[in-house]
């Protein structure tokens, strides 16, 4: 079985420490994962980056609910991006959709301008797209998105495996496709056999962290 890249989704400093000890390749730091993740507390961010040597992504999401952001929301998003850039973060996770459940390319370009030269991973919000493959292609064509989190339009990576495999086949040379959605230490190998991807993401992908 080929080497796979493990991205561990965490909420706290102790989870970051334990994920590093267990061999994670990268961390995604969020808050409120029960709500699909929000922007983490910046004191936690600073503590993690002071003490962890591996690559770290930061979620940028100012509120729960949908991903159709108001002008006021976008102002807050810009503030959050500006701040995490100043403290040394070089990769963010972000998603934005319009009222028609399509990727909001205009706001993606704004966020890319604000965050440059940071990398961007597009959030699993892509799974709610009314035109899933068309919107992934639009993201790829911006040449501003490094990677994409997806459950293949399903609730779990396992049930969406066939769609994820198609995404990798169509776009994997242009964007990192990160399989996500209830991936755990116990089901990772089975999911990998179905998808044959390179990148996997989960809160319990390395088992319990605290």
Predicted feature locations:
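N-terminal beta1-alpha1 ligand-phosphate binding loop
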Residues: 5-18, 22-38
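Glycine-rich phosphate-binding active-site loops on the catalytic face of alpha/beta enzymes
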Residues: 25-38, 83, 87-99, 143-158, ...
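Active-site pocket-lining/capping segments in soluble small-molecule metabolic enzymes
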Residues: 99-103, 107-111, 121, 127, ...
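Catalytic cores of alpha/beta
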Residues: 11-22, 58, 68-83, 106-108, ...
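Glycine/small-residue-rich loop that forms an oxyanion/phosphate-binding "nest" at active or ligand-binding sites
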Residues: 41-106, 207-209
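Histidine/lysine/aspartate-rich catalytic loop segments that bind and position anionic ligands
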Residues: 117-156
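Active-site beta-loop-alpha junctions enriched in small/polar residues
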Residues: 9-13, 32, 59-65, 97-99, ...
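Short, well-ordered coil/turn segments that N-cap beta-strands
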Residues: 2-6, 23-25, 52-56, 88-90, ...
């Amino acid at each position: 079985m080929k080497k796979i890249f493990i991205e561990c989704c965490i909420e706290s400093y102790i989870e970051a420490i334990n994920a590093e000890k267990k061999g994670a390749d990268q961390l995604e730091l969020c808050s409120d994962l029960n709500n699909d993740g929000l922007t983490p507390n910046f004191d936690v961010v600073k503590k993690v980056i002071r003490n962890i040597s591996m690559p770290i992504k930061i979620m940028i999401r100012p509120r729960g609910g949908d991903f159709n952001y108001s002008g006021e929301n976008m102002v807050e998003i810009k503030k959050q991006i500006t701040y995490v850039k100043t403290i040394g973060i070089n990769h963010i996770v972000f998603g934005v959709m319009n009222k028609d459940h399509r990727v909001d390319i205009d706001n993606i370009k704004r966020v890319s301008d604000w965050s440059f030269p940071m990398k961007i991973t597009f959030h699993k919000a892509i799974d709610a797209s009314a035109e899933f493959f068309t919107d992934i292609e639009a993201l790829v064509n911006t040449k501003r998105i490094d990677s994409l989190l997806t459950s293949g339009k399903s609730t779990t990576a396992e049930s969406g495996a066939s769609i994820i495999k198609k995404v990798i086949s169509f776009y994997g040379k242009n964007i990192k496709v990160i399989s996500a959605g209830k991936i755990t230490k116990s089901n990772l190998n089975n999911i990998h056999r179905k998808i044959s991807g390179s990148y996997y993401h989960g809160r319990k992908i390395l088992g319990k962290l605290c």
